[in-house]
Every structure is written in structure tokens, then in C-alpha cells.
């Protein structure tokens, strides 16, 4: 369950190619990731934001438009850029489509306007299985593209302008120092999921708090909840500042280093469902910081200079996030309840985009120095987030720790993205495993879902998939720092 911190989407292979010998994995916790631009670095390409990327789709509509054959994008560059991370991510989606959670999410009760794009679970599952087979078995890029053009409908995001233009950001999982007990240094807790938090049994969306008389009532705001002392006794783990607590809440997951150097993993376990207001946005809109300062390093330095000022803007966010302990194998998990893969998993608004499908991005991504590079790559829609709530937004998962944070902090570019949906007449060509088919025997109704995911959206129950270790990120040079990402 991941939150909102930004990173770029080069695969490890392409990253190494783009920065041969120059990048070294950044070490240390998020707290140590304060970075600045050096004088010799190129200025990142400016993004023109004449249209609000968070413009909302009208109720009852999805976020895609079906392309005519003449509008289909070229697939050659993305086909050639496939790597082991994409292979891992598409395998995870294929496995997810064999679970009861996927059938619940693609049930007629849950799909809403997405049913206008994908008829149901079996078509969505077949889309992933077919794409995986074609990517693996096609003799070359032309053969692959010809097959996809024939067998798939391609849908493009409506974007922020109705024509596909979108803001492409990124996020990652922070690494912080923490303690299992309160100390003079560690005195700011993350909280466990309260017993009286009520969520939808299928979607995991919060419904409210169970009152003593059995009724369901709204939760108070985050500020009111903390001031009321209602959560006393449900502390899970302790951090060194209120700002780091907020960073964890926004991201929904973290790798925590204990005083004895052992490692704990925390992940999203629920939220109150109150309105989410991003800290970076609040500070910028109020004129406290500039657009360029809307990154984690700058906001952290501001907090260190004037914690009371930053706390005022933290308090504008009414939503409260709760946490649970995770093992390293299942962490970090996205809104599908399965592990996300750095440089291959994407977060989108699941109310208007379909879960688990193959996507293709046409955008620019930033390197460690903030330079923009053309980027065309297949990825998997496997997550969502509190700040990613529009057709004009997508967030690429960049991994864990300071190296990912640097890339995330630099990723802020216009672009577009596409979804691939297998045409119904080709479904028989790609038979699903029995366990992946929608039948009365394998539809599980009413199974409690995991609470909404880290970033604030609903996370279904985990599918118990083992995360295969991904290749390490190429490391950024110590002499080429860049802003770390900001909570959006």
C-alpha cells in the first residue's frame, strides 16, 4: 500500500544504460535524503500546467476513450524496452486474476463505468494472459505490434484536457529510523487499525466508526482525533518527528530501521476516509513554497526551521491512516493487495481506470540530475493513491529508500498512457486457467478485503504472492543530488 512520493520509470537495464557507471545506490533513511541541485546540472524541462491535472471526470463516466485503428500508438519502442521487471509485474497481475479478490473487484456491483471498457473479470484476465503470451512469443516488434493491433482494443486516458494529456509523477517507499517503544528521540507514533473502523467488505473503502449503540458515524478529522486521545494504547511503532509520521501516512508504507539495526516493515491497514489534502499542494497554494520547492527535501528543511508553520498545513489534511506490520516478502503491496514492482507498477484512480491491466506510457522521465529523457514502456496498473484521483494523473512506483526518492522527486512531466483490452472474439484463443475463470464455485462473496491501500484508496485482500527480489537500482553519484519527492 503505497503513497505519494515521486520517481522515474526507467527499468534497471535502461537506467544503467542511461547513466553508465555514474549511479550508485543512495543509502540511508529518508531523513538523510536532503539534496539540492548542483550548478552544472541541466534545468529540468518545464511542465506547462495550463489545465488542472486533477480535473474530475463527471460522475458515472470512466477515464478512457477508445481509439480508432488509425490512432493506435506505435508499440515498437515499448516492446524493445521490456525487461525482467515488466515480466515480474505482468506475472503478478496474471496471478492476481486467479484470486477471489480480482473477481470481487470485477463483479458487476463493483465495476461501475469501467464495465463500458471491460465486460468483466474474464475479459480483463484474458487481456493480461494474451498480452503476456504475445510479448513472450512474437518474433520481433513488427510481429508483436501487428498481433496486438488485430486482437486488442486500445484505450487512451482522457487526461486533463480530454485528449490524453496527463501529469506523470512517481512515488516510493521511504526508509526511516524508528523504535518499538517510546523514547526521548522516538515519541511520535504510528497507530494500529482501530477495532471500531468499519470498511466495505469487498472494496475496503471506509464507511465510518462503529459507535457504542451500533450505528456508524463519521470519524473526526485527523487533528481532532489526535487531540482527543481516542487512539491511546493502539500505538504500533514510534518515529522521531510528526513530519515523518505524516510522510508514512501519505505513502502508506515504510521500511523502518530499529536502534539495533533490525528492520521492520509497516503498511497500510485502514483510513478514516476524511478528505485528503496534500501537504505540498497546500504549502504551494498558500505561497509558502514555490513549485520547484514542492519536494520532500525542501519541505523537511522548512519543517526543521519552522515546525509549527508546517504543522498548520499538515493539519489541513483531515484523513488519518492506520498501519500494520508486514513481512518483507509481501511488502510493499499496492491496492490489488499484491506486491508492487519498482519501475513496472503504476498507481491510478481505480474509480475510472481498470485494475491489473497492461498499460503503455509515452512521456518523459527524469534522471538523478533532473534531466528529462523520452520514455515509452509497458507497465502494469497495480496501485492507487489518495492524491491520484483524476484521469489526468498517473504515478509510477520507483522502489524503496533514498535512491528511489531522488528519482521520484524529479519526476514531474506531461505525457499520456494507454490500456490494452483483448477483443471478445479473441478470448477463446487464450483460455484461462480454471482457477482464473468466473464461475459460481470460485466467486467469493463478502470476503473481507484488506482496508484501503496505503495511499488512501481501497486495497483488496492480499493474494499471498511472493515478491521476487528485483535487480538493484543503479546508484546516483554522491555529487549529483536532486530534490527528494514530496508528499502530494
Label each residue range with its predicted role.
Residues 1-18:
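N-terminal secretory signal peptides that target proteins for export/translocation
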Residues 3-5, 99, 362-367:
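Short regulatory "switch" loops immediately downstream of catalytic or recognition motifs
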Residues 17, 22-30:
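Small-residue packing motifs within transmembrane alpha-helices
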Residues 37-40:
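C-terminal motif of bacterial Sec signal peptides marking the signal peptidase cleavage site
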Residues 42, 328-477, 483-488:
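C-terminal soluble interaction/assembly domains
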Residues 42-48:
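Bacterial lipoprotein signal-peptidase II cleavage site
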Residues 55-327, 331-338, 488:
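Secretory/export targeting leaders with adjacent low-complexity proregions
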Amino acid at each position: 500500500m503505497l503513497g505519494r512520493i515521486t520517481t522515474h520509470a526507467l527499468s534497471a537495464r535502461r537506467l544503467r544504460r542511461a547513466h553508465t557507471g555514474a549511479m550508485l545506490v543512495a543509502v540511508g533513511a529518508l531523513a538523510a535524503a536532503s539534496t539540492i541541485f548542483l550548478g552544472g546540472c541541466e534545468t529540468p524541462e518545464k511542465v506547462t500546467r495550463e489545465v488542472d491535472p486533477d480535473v474530475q471526470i463527471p460522475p458515472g463516466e470512466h477515464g478512457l476513450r477508445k481509439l480508432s485503428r488509425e490512432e493506435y500508438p506505435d508499440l515498437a519502442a515499448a516492446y524493445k524496452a521490456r525487461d525482467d521487471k515488466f515480466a515480474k509485474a505482468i506475472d503478478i497481475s496474471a496471478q492476481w486474476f486467479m484470486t477471489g479478490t480480482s473477481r470481487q473487484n470485477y463483479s458487476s456491483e463493483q465495476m461501475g463505468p469501467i464495465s463500458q471498457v471491460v465486460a468483466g473479470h474474464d475479459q480483463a484476465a484474458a487481456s493480461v494472459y494474451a498480452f503476456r503470451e504475445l510479448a513472450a512469443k512474437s518474433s520481433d516488434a513488427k510481429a508483436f505490434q501487428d498481433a496486438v493491433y488485430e486482437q486488442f482494443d486500445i484505450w487512451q486516458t482522457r487526461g486533463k484536457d480530454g485528449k490524453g494529456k496527463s501529469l506523470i509523477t512517481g512515488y516510493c517507499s521511504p526508509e526511516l529510523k524508528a523504535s518499538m517503544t517510546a523514547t526521548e528521540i522516538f515519541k511520535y507514533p504510528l497507530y494500529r487499525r482501530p477495532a471500531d473502523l468499519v470498511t466495505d467488505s469487498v472494496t475496503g473503502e471506509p464507511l465510518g466508526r462503529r459507535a457504542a449503540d451500533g450505528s456508524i458515524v463519521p470519524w473526526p478529522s485527523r487533528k481532532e482525533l489526535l487531540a482527543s486521545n481516542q487512539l491511546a494504547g493502539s500505538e504500533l511503532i514510534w518515529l522521531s518527528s510528526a513530519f515523518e509520521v505524516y510522510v508514512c501516512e501519505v505513502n502508506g508504507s515504510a521500511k523502518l530501521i530499529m536502534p539495533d539495526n533490525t528492520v521492520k516493515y509497516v503498511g497500510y491497514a485502514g483510513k478514516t476516509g476524511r478528505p485528503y489534502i496534500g501537504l505540498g499542494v497546500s504549502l504551494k497554494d498558500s505561497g509558502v513554497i514555490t513549485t520547484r520547492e514542492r519536494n520532500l527535501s525542501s519541505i523537511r528543511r522548512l519543517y526543521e526551521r519552522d515546525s509549527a508553520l508546517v504543522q498548520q498545513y499538515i493539519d489541513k489534511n483531515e484523513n488519518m491512516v492506520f498501519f500494520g506490520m508486514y513481512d518483507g516478502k509481501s511488502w510493499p503491496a499496492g491496492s490489488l493487495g499484491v506486491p508492487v514492482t519498482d519501475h513496472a507498477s503504476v498507481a491510478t484512480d481505480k474509480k475510472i481506470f481498470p485494475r491489473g491491466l497492461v498499460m503503455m506510457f509515452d512521456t518523459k522521465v527524469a534522471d538523478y540530475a533532473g534531466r528529462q529523457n523520452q520514455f515509452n514502456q509497458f507497465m502494469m496498473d497495480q496501485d492507487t493513491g489518495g492524491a491520484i484521483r483524476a484521469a489526468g494523473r498517473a504515478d509510477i512506483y520507483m522502489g524503496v529508500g533514498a535512491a528511489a526518492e531522488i528519482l521520484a522527486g524529479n519526476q514531474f512531466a506531461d505525457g499520456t498512457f494507454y490500456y490494452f483490452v483483448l477483443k471478445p472474439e479473441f478470448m477463446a484463443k487464450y483460455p484461462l486457467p480454471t482457477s482464473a475463470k468466473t464461475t459460481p464455485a470460485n466467486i467469493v462473496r463478502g470476503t473481507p478485503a484488506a482496508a484501503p491501500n496505503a495511499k488512501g484508496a481501497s486495497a483488496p485482500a492480499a493474494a499471498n504472492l511472493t515478491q521476487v527480489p528485483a535487480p538493484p537500482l543503479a546508484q546516483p553519484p554522491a555529487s549529483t543530488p536532486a530534490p527528494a519527492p514530496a508528499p502530494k
